[in-house]
Design a protein with these regions (language model features):
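Carbohydrate transferase catalytic cores enriched for Leloir-type hexosyltransferases
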Residues: 1-229
Length: 229
């Protein structure tokens, strides 16, 4: 079976969406090696985090072929990519980051889309009006035409049902995994060197992520204050 991926963020994003895309491709290609995986991306950027694809016989990377698609990559990814999916005999196409191309629902290609959150609806003040309208149109289209939806949390599933009127039977909750790089055992000496270098106190909390209002860090800190000493 040939499975296609919207792999743009696997090559260009170094945070949540990129990690999800890379891990999904890496894990599937390893544990389901009999399938062929085709990664569709506007640009094949040099990315050390995608080095796992090198030497993988069941992974192929495809970029826009025609001049117009190379120049208008957003249009290619939004619509014209459907032609390339046909040319490559794709059986299943997975939109890894909230989107599916227009017109794919008119083909025989089965589709899956992963929805990470609908925060632009739940907290609209964090986004400008134009972005909210674009996101709403893209996300709703993907959820409507997809054969299957993956939600990364139960809350996201509830939001999809509530805001897009999608049947809950169409949605599967699959929590994002953790790359083994985050599970590495660090020698005690190395820990102490880092603690000394950065003057870290005895009691501390490590947060890995961007500092933004939508990350809810303020509520986290307020909760800590209420914990018993």
């Amino acid at each position: 079976m040939k499975i296609g991926f919207d792999a743009k963020r696997a090559f260009s994003n170094y945070t949540g969406l990129g990690n999800y895309a890379r891990d999904t491709i890496r894990i599937l290609s390893h544990y389901a090696p009999n399938n062929n995986y085709v990664l569709f991306t506007p640009n094949k950027n040099n990315n050390i985090r995608t080095s796992f694809i090198h030497g993988k016989e069941n992974i192929l990377v495809k970029t826009p072929e025609t001049l117009i698609n190379k120049f208008f990559t957003k249009f290619w990814r939004t619509k014209n990519i459907v032609n390339d999916l046909h040319k490559n005999d794709i059986h299943i196409y997975h939109g890894l980051s909230n989107e599916l191309p227009i017109g794919i629902e008119k083909t025989s290609i089965k589709t899956v889309v992963t929805i990470h959150d609908l925060i632009f609806i739940r907290h609209p003040h964090l986004f400008n009006t134009i972005d909210r309208k674009i996101y709403y149109k893209k996300f709703k289209h993907a959820c409507t035409v997809a054969n299957k939806i993956i939600a990364v949390s139960k809350q996201t599933k509830k939001d999809i049902v509530k805001y897009f009127n999608i049947s809950p039977n169409k949605i599967t909750v699959a929590y994002q995994g953790c790359n083994q790089v985050f599970q590495s055992k660090i020698p005690e000496l190395q820990k102490q060197l880092v603690i000394k270098k950065h003057k870290i106190p005895k009691d501390y909390l490590l947060y890995v992520g961007t500092i933004e209002e939508r990350k809810n860090l303020l509520a986290f800190l307020k909760t800590i204050q209420q914990l018993p000493k």
